[in-house]
Regions:
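Short histidine-centered loop motifs in beta-beta connectors
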Residues: 118-143, 176-185
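Transmembrane alpha-helical segments and their short flanking loops
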Residues: 1-48
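Zn2+-dependent peptidoglycan hydrolase active-site motif and core
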Residues: 95-125
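Polar/charged, compositionally biased leader and regulatory segments
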Residues: 38-84, 191-201
Length: 201
């Protein structure tokens, strides 16, 4: 019949048949459209990675870091943390990629692919591991909230060091923060920000 023949049929054929066909097809079309919209919303939510507070303490802007390398975001974007008790926990599920020999910094690759560096203290590399205890090793799988390290805050500060903790996403070029972090006191395990993969990377 061809397309032109079909148009002719609908113009001259039984109008009731057209109505029946429309009634049969339209519900499927609406159902498909609704399912696609819900699927896209679900995928959008799934693509956001939740980063939780790795210490009991406070969060402030990374730009306030005493270490200018972190403050300038040369190593990536993130937040500046202050621990109340010197205990550091995993901010996400992932694998330990790096434990610095001096124990003052730990790198994690999350299960979603973000690479997070937690740096304990400013210039504390000079302590050569003194006052630090690390509870994980490279290639260990960790869960969010699992203890990673401890440091003796009192002793480190007595030596004249700042115990601030920059936490940065070192492959931030692949991500964007979904919503600005709230700068306040948190308990470990509370959500502090989300990461969303950039679509054009």
């Amino acid at each position: 019949m061809g397309i032109t023949g079909l148009f002719g049929f609908f113009q001259t054929g039984d109008v009731k048949l057209v109505g029946v066909l429309l009634m049969a097809v339209l519900p499927f079309g609406f159902t498909w459209l609704i399912e696609m919209l819900l699927y896209r919303q679900e995928k959008a939510v799934e693509s956001e990675e939740i980063i939780v507070m790795p210490v009991n303490g406070s969060v402030e802007q990374l730009e306030n870091a005493e270490d200018t390398v972190f403050a300038s975001k040369a190593l990536g974007d993130g937040v500046l943390l202050h621990s109340d008790d010197g205990k550091v926990y995993a901010p996400c599920d992932g694998i330990i990629q790096t434990v610095f020999p001096t124990k003052h910094a730990i790198g994690i690759e999350s299960t979603d692919g973000s690479e997070i560096l937690i740096h304990m203290g400013n210039n504390t590399v000079a302590l050569n591991g003194k006052y630090f205890t690390v509870h994980v090793k490279e290639k260990d799988e960790v869960k969010a909230g699992q203890i990673l390290a401890e440091f003796d805050k009192k002793e480190i500060e007595a030596q004249g060091y700042n115990c601030e903790i920059p936490m940065v996403v070192t492959n931030m070029e692949m991500y964007e923060m979904s919503g600005e972090p709230t700068y306040r006191n948190y308990k470990k395990g509370e959500e502090i920000f989300r990461l969303k993969k950039k679509t054009n990377v």
